[in-house]
């Protein structure tokens, strides 16, 4: 096929012609209906793919190497075969995805792989340049990151990117790619030695992209700039009958190419029609997606357009997902115009497009998709060649064989106004290519070199380019035309271009240069001309390109930074206005439904910030041109958002206009922070001339304001009143100015700024922000609503912006610069705080503008003055940047930890991000200043506590503590510094001022203004005001300020110095007034501080101060004061020597006092030895026979006995009863308690992974393996019925009224103790009884009448999920029989739990009190049923026969329980009978076991059987062994028997304890003077434990037991063939030691897969769960039902646990009601944190065995449902309501408490407070699996259960459901109560039973109404609810058939 003379030219012509003539192929030529279009779509894709692949295969030679999974016979032999369309067969070009993973390699290039949904995105804190550098699953090599902080995220549609592996700039050191490690370099057919393959690829790609550009160059109709005028033109032509003009315009808009022209010239025939539109054939209506309409609006518009597809929803869904869809097509264009205008009139974007053009656009789409498919071919050589070819073709100039049609004439003729004809930006503003099909001229600007000496308040002069030479590359064309593509096409174009070019070292610089060239075009396109601006490629391009330092430098050095920043500035300037002489941005007030303005604003600011952040040379940014451009952008937001205080009425609707200002100004602050960071990191390389020049530029700009002044005394101060005028919070340029000043010596700053016109003009704006925040904080702006309060808090407390602290620094500079004019600065400051009139006495404090808030504003004012004086970190000298960072980190940690210990995550969240960038620095400082406290329980996290000695460094009035109350903070500090209250009262919290030698020399004068007479006067007036009214809240802060002033004076002028101004003003008099004030007038802190300051003043200047005090208070008063102080140890006149002597004497007295206290404590402790106790001891401690047990109703809290008690229970199938073939690991593994074997962390064999069977066998399986769980909260039956009725619960679905535990049934309990319990038990243990225990129970159980008995017998068992039929066993519904079986199962479960203990033998009977109490309650219930039930022997025998045939693994022990309770035999005989039969069966089983594992058993370690060798040799003959048996075989047999029999023996001991507790109430088991607790259970090994139990229980030894087993087998024996029960430790699946293993080394963890065939790429996906029961990996499904599906497949019961590795959580799942709770996984990091917090920073997380054991115990004991109900609280009630009420649809909550990300932290494992959040708020509906009506109505009908109205967060939801059901069922029905129905059917027979005293009923009702867990308004709700029901209402008992009452005997 290839022409050898010029193959490239021939190939290009062939591809060009094929693409250009694709419309003429028979398969695609004619228009088609909706069904035909669907087929054509597949045909077009098949044609495109097959043709392209063949054209790049060198005539098919390379196809077998590209598609290795395809048989060579299926490949086409020539191009014609390649172009054949065969939809019926599998395409031959299918890429083998699974095979590709093993062959992945990107040797010699950057990986650049696009992340696919579900795949992990890896980041390494230590290795990466920044957070944008990521690795894919194929490249990530765990060996490179051992000990590093590796953290992952999951790729989603909105969180994606490309792999940076191989990019040297992305990583701090070279990485070893996993793909390169696994694959060697192999020679293949793609080695391109002669360049032939490259040229072939380039030729195909050139024509592909040229055709693509040609098609979309002519496709201008979708442009937003064209659509409106186009519609207007069409309407004008049609309305005025100008059909020729209409046809001409449509013809010029249609797509044309040279091949079409050739075809028309050959087929042209003269038209005879008079209708000009008849020449326009085959048109279609295309509807495009936009961001203006919702789903329903789009559907309505489409319906009006008359689509040819009746499935409107499918069309709408396609438009939403793909971005466009074809509505209908027709050969007659006139028939389409009505539909076209109908869709347009509804606002949807649509075009009327020729069929050929639509076909070519679709071909272009598949062409791009084909390129993306090629990028997945698993051949590294091909990938290198293909990617290089793509880069070369895209970055080269667009020079097609045939020039595309120039559309500029169409734009000029139809879509532009005449006055715009000379506009140079006409085509750019219409987003069309310019003349000659070139990139049109854009807005490229640069600063005028002659205007860089100052920053204009408006805009500096710029030079706009009138001509620009663009590269005109294919890349620029494809990006420029982007806003014409629809959603799907845009996405695949971006997936092609950005990863491919950004990952190429050769083409990445070209990509950058060409993108920056058209950056102005793309920015304006996104802003004004994009239908879907959120899909722009600009954002992703910026992320991939501008984050590269080399790229950033090239942009600056090439001068192209102008293009970027001026395009951003231009967009903002378009929305700016003049305000007080400056140009500032204002909120957009134009209609913008696409939100393109917001997207463009954010994108532009992000681009600038990203570029600046990658610059390391600060001089690039300080150059006048670049600096002015950056400031020009920032100054648009300097004071942009101004607010004015409102007066009068409160606002009805708060102003939310501040949000965009806040959002964009915050981004500007980020740019400034980035700018400062660049200066900090390269401080030694800063050109000081450039820096000073930048300061001068800002000084002149900020000082240019012409402000109004007013004359106060002799000083000109600025005239401004914050409470009356418009004022702004944020001034980012002032913040930048503060940063710059800090980078030069303070002396230089003062010299430069002293030349300012008036520095107060600059500092005053910062002062306004401070005052504004203070006024808002005190509630002075309350009329403006809450929004201003949020703004103020955001401004002050956002350390990332540093704005508030910078305002403080600018005001500090005012005192340093204006040091010769302090009075003016102070007066200006007082005026700005609006306190000047009060200060000069013009108005009293009560008549200022603040009225009653004067105290609060002065408190803020004093804090401001203190910060001006004390905040000196700005001037602290540091040698290195690291020293600066460590200092700031240390201060931040100290001030966050002093109030309370914090977890690591909470601490990080409270500290600015820029201080936590270096993890090592942060951790080093944290270790230095804090003490780590490990988590002590199962639910808490590790916390860090501040070291005690550091509390002395805390200053509660500093900026670091600004968010906390000063006095409260001081109290906390004092409480940590002193242990007793007396000591705390003496402690004075001192101001913390940096020493002068740590500061810049000029900073020593910062406090000079505080020593002036004017300032001393201010302090005096403030203190006088505080003394005049002790209720003022600023006194403590004011005293702290005075303390700081004295401390600063000491530092400057010496230790004994005291400012003269503070002596001349009688401040000391006021201090004494505070000290001697009445008790309670001032707080202890205030009095102590005042006393300290007064002492300090007297000590320094005793004469002057005492004279002032005497003059004020009188001589006698001061004399008394001196005496009082002397008594306190303060003598103002004593010498230094006298003071030392006095202190020594005091210390001696303290020592003697301490000794006396210790002596008294010793005597008190040993008082018993010195005094006798003659009190009598009450020896009568025994219980009376027949005494009632103490039962109290949980609802009415009464203990009356005329109503029987029931216990709420939860009973359900448990999967822990494992039946399986024995294995050596199970039999011979010793018990050492709960453990975890990382090497087994694959899957838990086949123990738990069992497919659920249907039918009778599954019913029997689940019915016989139920366990019963209870909270053991008793309740009267009548109270219970009333509770169920009122709450509208069902008896098989309710929660305990006391503890909110999920229950599904109740059991009645007897309240009478047995008489002579000890004697009976002793007899049963050894000698037997005259009758069975059950009959003995019945004799002592309480009497009840027949009616009560019938009620008790009607209580049914819970059969959740079981559908009974007439063939099912009757005993399943017999509560007595099922309870006896569940009693046995509960004991088995309790024994399994004890195996998890560290000492499984000694702790068998210790702990688990609740579970033993449950066993007692079951026995009490059996006692009740024994009296009432008269089972026929036939039913009982059938019951036991069914149990025997059900393969119940614990059947042997059930036989023990059954014979002990029902037979007259002794306990010993019952047990021995079972053990003997089991020995026979086990002997037989050992034979098959040995033969199966013979080779493995030869090396097995086991117990020594020497003591029993003789009898074992005889016994083993039954296993098929001969007489000569090896010693090792006997040892194996001996160990086998012990392992198999031990569980039954242990359970028998538990049975004994349960009987002992039930019959006697005691816990100790001492039979025949043998103490079980200290005897049989105290053993170190399984063997010793076994023999001790044998001796105790059977009063014999193992030898005799073996001998007894030699007797002949009884024909009735059923235990010989009993199923084998798993006898090792039962637990959840083994897990990896480190959770990170699942995340970072996923491929090395072999897990059983349970993936859905519809889920793709399962090998690399990380969004999976692990079933902790069976260890199966379950991949996420789109419908969120993966857990439910797994539970349906596996026999796990109704609840499950699923580990979610990627978020470190465990999902607890409950199937009925369907709900989930997410808790932290049992993994902890080094900081003691769990859950998301443990892994979000990449910390190594280790499995915590205690927490995992706790989860295991929760699972074994069937406690997950109860735990879920308690955690969910009200949400569980909603889940129950959904499960019972909705008969067709139900709210489906797949993750009721899922916590992924949000931003709240995971505090504790199983923290009930944290599980109410829902990260998946969307509610979906689905069909319920079961009928949601309960049977048991009074006349055979169903009971419709209505929802109760509940309080709490879901109150409104309950009301909604109630109203909905009321509307469905009607109103006015009278609902009878359960009591009414019973009385109606049974007469008054029940009156005696329910006849409790009135006081009890009243007590119950009152208590029920006040119960915190119940409704306080139940009466009201119940009355209201009764009106919404019109059907019969019966007893709440499910399955309660009243007709059966008369049949009960």
UniProtKB/Swiss-Prot annotation:
A GO CC term assigned to this protein in UniProt: cytoplasm
Matching InterPro entries: E3_ligase_UBR-like_C (IPR044046), UBR1-like (IPR039164), UBR1-like_winged-helix (IPR055194), Znf_UBR (IPR003126)
Zinc finger (UBR-type): 109-182
Record keywords: Metal-binding, Transferase, Ubl conjugation pathway, Zinc, Zinc-finger
Catalytic activity: S-ubiquitinyl-[E2 ubiquitin-conjugating enzyme]-L-cysteine + [acceptor protein]-L-lysine = [E2 ubiquitin-conjugating enzyme]-L-cysteine + N(6)-ubiquitinyl-[acceptor protein]-L-lysine
Zinc finger (RING-type): 1193-1300
Molecular function GO terms recorded: ubiquitin protein ligase activity; zinc ion binding
Enzyme class: transferase
EC number: 2.3.2.27
Residue ranges with Acidic residues bias: 1907-1927
GO BP terms, alphabetized: protein ubiquitination; ubiquitin-dependent protein catabolic process via the N-end rule pathway
Pathway linked to the protein: Protein modification; protein ubiquitination
SMART domains associated with the record: ZnF_UBR1 (SM00396)
A Pfam short name: zf-UBR
Residue numbers spanned by region Disordered: 1901-1945
Domain of life according to the entry: Eukaryota
Gene3D superfamilies the UniProt entry points to: 2.10.110.30
Function description: Ubiquitin ligase protein which is a component of the N-end rule pathway. Recognizes and binds to proteins bearing specific N-terminal residues that are destabilizing according to the N-end rule, leading to their ubiquitination and subsequent degradation.
PANTHER family found in the cross-reference section: E3 UBIQUITIN-PROTEIN LIGASE UBR1 (PTHR21497:SF26), UBIQUITIN LIGASE E3 ALPHA-RELATED (PTHR21497)
Family membership: Belongs to the E3 ubiquitin-protein ligase UBR1-like family.
Entry text on domains: The RING-H2 zinc finger is an atypical RING finger with a His ligand in place of the fourth Cys of the classical motif.
Protein name: E3 ubiquitin-protein ligase UBR1
Primary gene name: UBR1
């Amino acid at each position: 096929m290839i022409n050898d003379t010029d193959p490239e030219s021939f190939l290009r012509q062939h591809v060009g012609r094929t693409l250009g003539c694709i419309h003429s192929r028979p398969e695609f030529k004619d228009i088609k209906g909706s069904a035909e279009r669907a087929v054509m779509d597949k045909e077009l894709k098949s044609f495109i793919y097959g043709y392209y692949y063949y054209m790049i295969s060198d005539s098919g030679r390379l196809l077998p190497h590209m598609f290795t999974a395809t048989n060579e016979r299926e490949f086409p032999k020539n191009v014609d075969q390649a172009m054949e369309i065969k939809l019926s067969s599998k395409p031959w070009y299918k890429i083998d995805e699974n095979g590709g993973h093993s062959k992945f390699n990107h040797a010699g290039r950057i990986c650049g792989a696009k992340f696919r949904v579900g795949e992990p995105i890896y980041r390494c804190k230590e290795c990466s340049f920044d957070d944008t550098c990521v690795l894919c699953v194929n490249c990530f090599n765990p060996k490179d990151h051992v000990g590093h902080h590796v953290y992952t995220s999951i790729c989603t549609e909105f969180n994606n990117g490309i792999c940076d592996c191989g990019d040297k700039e992305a990583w701090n050191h070279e990485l070893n790619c996993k793909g390169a490690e696994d694959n060697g370099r192999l020679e293949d057919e793609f080695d391109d030695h002669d360049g032939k393959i490259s040229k072939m690829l380039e030729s195909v790609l050139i024509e592909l992209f040229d055709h693509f550009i040609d098609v979309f160059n002519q496709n201008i109709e979708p442009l937003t700039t064209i659509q409106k005028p186009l519609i207007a033109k069409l309407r004008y032509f049609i309305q005025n009958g100008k059909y020729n003009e209409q046809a001409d315009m449509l013809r010029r808009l249609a797509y044309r190419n040279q091949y079409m022209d050739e075809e028309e010239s050959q087929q042209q025939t003269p038209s005879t029609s008079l209708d000009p539109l008849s020449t326009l054939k085959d048109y279609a209506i295309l509807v495009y997606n936009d961001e203006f309409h919702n789903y329903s609006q789009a559907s309505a518009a489409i319906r009006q357009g008359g689509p040819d597809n009746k499935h409107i929803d499918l069309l709408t869904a396609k438009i939403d997902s793909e971005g466009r869809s074809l509505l209908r097509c027709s050969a007659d264009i006139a028939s389409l115009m009505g539909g076209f205008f109908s869709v347009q009139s509804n606002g949807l974007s649509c075009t009327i497009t020729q069929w050929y053009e639509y076909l070519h656009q679709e071909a272009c789409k598949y062409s791009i998709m084909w390129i993306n498919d090629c990028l997945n071919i698993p051949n590294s050589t091909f990938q290198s060649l293909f990617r290089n070819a793509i880069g070369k073709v895209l970055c080269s100039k667009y020079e097609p064989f045939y020039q595309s049609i120039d559309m500029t004439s169409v734009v000029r003729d139809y879509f532009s106004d005449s006055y715009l004809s000379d506009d140079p930006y006409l085509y750019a503003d219409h987003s069309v290519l310019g003349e000659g099909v070139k990139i049109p001229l854009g807005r490229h600007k640069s600063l005028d070199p002659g205007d860089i000496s100052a920053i204009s308040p408006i805009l500096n002069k710029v030079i706009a380019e009138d001509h620009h030479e663009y590269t005109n590359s294919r890349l620029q064309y494809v990006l420029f035309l982007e806003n014409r593509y629809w959603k799907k096409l845009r996405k695949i174009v971006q997936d092609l271009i950005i990863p491919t070019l950004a990952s190429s070292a050769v083409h990445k610089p070209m990509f950058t240069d060409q993108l920056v060239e058209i950056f102005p075009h793309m920015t304006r396109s996104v802003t004004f001309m994009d239908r879907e601006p959120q899909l722009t490629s600009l954002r992703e391009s910026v992320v991939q390109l501008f984050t590269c330092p080399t790229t950033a430098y090239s942009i600056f050095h090439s001068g192209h930074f102008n293009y970027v920043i001026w395009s951003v500035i231009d967009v903002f300037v378009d929305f700016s206005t003049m305000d007080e002489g400056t140009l500032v941005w204002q909120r957009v007030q134009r209609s913008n439904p696409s939100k393109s303005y917001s997207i463009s604003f954010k994108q532009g600011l992000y681009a600038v910030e990203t570029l600046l952040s990658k610059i390391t040379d600060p001089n690039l940014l300080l150059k006048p041109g670049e600096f002015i451009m950056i400031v020009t952008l920032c100054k648009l937001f300097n004071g942009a958002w101004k607010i004015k205080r409102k007066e009068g009425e409160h606002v009805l609707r708060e102003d939310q206009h501040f949000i965009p200002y806040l959002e964009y100004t915050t981004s500007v602050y980020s740019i400034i922070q980035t700018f400062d960071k660049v200066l900090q990191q390269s401080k030694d390389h800063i050109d000081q001339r450039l820096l000073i020049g930048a300061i001068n530029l800002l000084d002149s700009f900020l000082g240019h304001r012409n402000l109004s002044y007013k004359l106060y005394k002799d000083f000109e101060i600025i005239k401004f009143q914050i409470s009356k005028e418009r004022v702004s919070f944020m001034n980012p340029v002032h913040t930048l100015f503060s940063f710059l000043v800090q980078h030069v010596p303070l002396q230089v700053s003062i010299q430069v700024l002293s030349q300012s016109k008036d520095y107060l003009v600059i500092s005053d704006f910062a002062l306004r922000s401070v005052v504004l925040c203070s006024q808002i904080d005190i509630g002075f702006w309350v009329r403006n609503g809450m929004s201003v309060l949020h703004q103020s808090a955001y401004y002050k407390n956002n350390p990332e912006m540093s704005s508030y602290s910078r305002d403080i620094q600018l005001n500090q500079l005012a005192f340093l610069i204006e040091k010769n004019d302090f009075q003016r600065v102070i007066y200006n400051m007082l005026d700005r705080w609006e306190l000047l009139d009060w200060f000069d006495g013009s108005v009293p404090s009560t008549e200022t503008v603040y009225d009653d808030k004067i105290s609060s504003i002065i408190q803020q004012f004093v804090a401001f003055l203190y910060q001006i004086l004390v905040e000196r970190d700005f001037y602290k000298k540091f040698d290195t940047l690291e020293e600066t960072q460590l200092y700031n980190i240390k201060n931040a940690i100290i001030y966050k930890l002093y109030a309370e210990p914090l977890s690591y995550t909470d601490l990080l969240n409270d500290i600015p991000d820029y201080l936590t960038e270096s993890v090592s620095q942060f951790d080093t400082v944290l270790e230095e200043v804090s003490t780590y406290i490990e988590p002590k329980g199962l639910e808490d996290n590790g916390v860090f506590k501040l070291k005690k000695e550091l509390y002395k460094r805390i200053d509660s009035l500093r900026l670091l503590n600004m968010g906390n109350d000063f006095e409260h903070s001081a109290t906390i500090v004092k409480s940590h510094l002193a242990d007793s209250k007396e000591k705390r009262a003496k402690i004075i919290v001192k101001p913390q001022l940096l020493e002068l030698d740590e500061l810049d020399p000029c900073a020593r004068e910062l406090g000079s203004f505080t020593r002036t007479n004017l300032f001393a006067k201010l302090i005096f007036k403030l203190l006088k005001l505080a003394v005049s009214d002790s209720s003022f809240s600023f006194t403590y802060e004011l005293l702290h300020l005075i303390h700081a002033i004295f401390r600063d004076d000491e530092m400057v002028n010496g230790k004994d110095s005291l400012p003269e101004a503070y002596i001349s003003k009688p401040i000391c008099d006021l201090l004494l007034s505070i000290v001697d004030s009445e008790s309670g007038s001032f707080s202890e802190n205030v009095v102590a501080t005042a006393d300290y300051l007064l002492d300090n003043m007297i000590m320094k200047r005793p004469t002057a101060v005492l004279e002032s005090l005497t003059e004020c208070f009188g001589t006698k008063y001061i004399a008394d004061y001196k005496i009082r102080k002397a008594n306190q140890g303060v003598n103002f006149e004593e010498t230094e020597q006298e003071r030392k002597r006095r202190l020594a004497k005091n210390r001696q007295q303290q020592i003697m006092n301490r000794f006396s206290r210790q002596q008294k404590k010793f005597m008190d402790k040993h008082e018993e030895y010195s005094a006798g106790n003659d009190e009598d001891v009450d020896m009568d401690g025994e219980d009376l026979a027949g005494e009632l047990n103490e039962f109290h109703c949980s609802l009415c809290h009464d203990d009356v006995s005329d109503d029987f008690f029931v216990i709420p229970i939860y009973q359900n199938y448990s999967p822990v009863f494992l039946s399986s073939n024995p294995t050596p690991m199970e039999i011979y593994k010793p018990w050492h308690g709960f453990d975890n074997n990382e090497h087994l962390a694959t899957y838990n064999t086949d123990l738990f992974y069992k497919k659920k069977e249907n039918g009778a066998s599954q019913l029997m399986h689940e019915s016989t393996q139920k366990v019963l769980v209870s909270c053991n909260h008793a309740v009267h039956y009548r109270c219970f019925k009333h509770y169920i009725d009122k709450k509208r619960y069902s008896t098989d679905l309710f929660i305990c009224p006391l503890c909110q535990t999920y229950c599904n049934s109740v059991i009645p309990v007897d309240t009478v103790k047995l008489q002579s319990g000890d004697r009976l038990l002793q007899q049963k243990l050894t000698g037997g009884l005259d009758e069975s225990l059950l009959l003995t129970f019945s004799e002592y159980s309480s009497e009840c009448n027949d009616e009560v008995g019938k009620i008790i017998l009607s209580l049914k068992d819970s059969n959740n999920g079981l559908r009974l039929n007439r063939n099912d066993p009757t005993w399943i519904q017999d509560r007595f029989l099922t309870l006896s079986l569940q009693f046995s199962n509960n004991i088995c479960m309790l024994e399994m739990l004890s195996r998890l203990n560290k000492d499984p033998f000694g702790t068998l009977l210790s702990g688990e009190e609740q579970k033993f109490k449950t066993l007692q309650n079951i026995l009490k219930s059996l006692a009740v049923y024994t009296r009432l039930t008269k089972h026929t022997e036939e039913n009982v025998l059938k019951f036991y026969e069914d149990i025997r045939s059900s393969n119940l693994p614990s059947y042997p022990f059930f036989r023990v329980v059954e014979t002990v309770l029902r037979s007259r035999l002794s306990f010993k005989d019952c047990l021995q009978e079972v053990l003997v039969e089991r020995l026979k069966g086990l002997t037989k089983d050992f034979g098959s076991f040995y033969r199966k594992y013979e080779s493995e058993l030869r090396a097995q370690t086991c117990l020594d059987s020497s003591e029993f060798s003789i009898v074992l040799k005889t016994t083993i003959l039954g296993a098929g062994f001969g007489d000569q048996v090896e010693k090792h075989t006997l040892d194996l047999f001996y160990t086998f028997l012990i392992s198999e029999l031990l569980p039954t023996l242990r359970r028998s001991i538990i049975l004994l304890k349960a009987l002992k507790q039930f019959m006697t109430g005691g816990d100790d088991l001492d039979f025949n003077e043998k103490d079980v607790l200290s005897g049989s259970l105290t053993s170190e090994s399984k063997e010793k434990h076994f023999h001790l139990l044998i001796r105790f229980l059977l009063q014999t030894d193992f030898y005799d037991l073996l001998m007894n087993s030699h007797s002949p087998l009884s024909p009735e024996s059923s235990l010989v063939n009993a199923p084998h029960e798993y006898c090792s430790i039962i637990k959840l699946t083994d897990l990896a030691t480190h959770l990170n293993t699942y995340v970072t080394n996923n491929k090395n963890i072999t897990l059983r897969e349970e993936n859905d065939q519809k889920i793709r790429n399962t090998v690399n996906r990380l969004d999976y769960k692990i079933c902790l029961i069976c260890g199966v990996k379950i991949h996420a499904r789109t419908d969120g039902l993966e857990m439910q599906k797994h539970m349906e497949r596996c026999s796990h019961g109704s609840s499950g646990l699923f580990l979610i590795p990627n978020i470190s959580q465990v999902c607890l799942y409950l199937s009925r009601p369907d709900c989930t709770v997410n808790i932290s996984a049992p993994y902890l990091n080094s900081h003691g944190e769990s859950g998301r917090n443990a892994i979000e920073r990449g910390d190594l997380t280790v499995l915590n065995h205690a927490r995992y054991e706790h989860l295991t115990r929760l699972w074994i004991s069937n406690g997950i449902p109860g735990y879920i109900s308690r955690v969910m609280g009200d949400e569980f009630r909603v889940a129950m309501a959904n499960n019972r009420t909705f008969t067709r649809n139900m709210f489906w909550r797949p993750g009721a408490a899922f916590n992924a990300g949000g931003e709240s932290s995971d505090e504790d494992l199983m923290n009930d407070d944290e599980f109410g959040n829902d990260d998946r708020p969307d509610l979906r509906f689905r069909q319920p699996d079961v009928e949601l009506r309960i049977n048991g109505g009074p006349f055979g009908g169903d009971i419709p259960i209505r929802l109760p109205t509940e309080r709490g967060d879901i109150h409104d939801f309950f009301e909604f459901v109630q109203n909905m059901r009321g509307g469905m069922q009607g109103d006015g029905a009278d609902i009878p109560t359960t009591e009414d129905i019973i009385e109606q059917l049974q007469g008054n027979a029940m009156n005696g039973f329910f006849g409790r005293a009135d006081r009890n009923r009243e007590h119950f009702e009152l208590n029920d109404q006040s119960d915190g867990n119940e409704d306080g308004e139940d009466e009201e709700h119940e009355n209201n609810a009764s009106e919404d029901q019109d059907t019969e209402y019966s007893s709440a008992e499910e399955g309660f058939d009243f007709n059966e009452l008369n049949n009960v005997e």
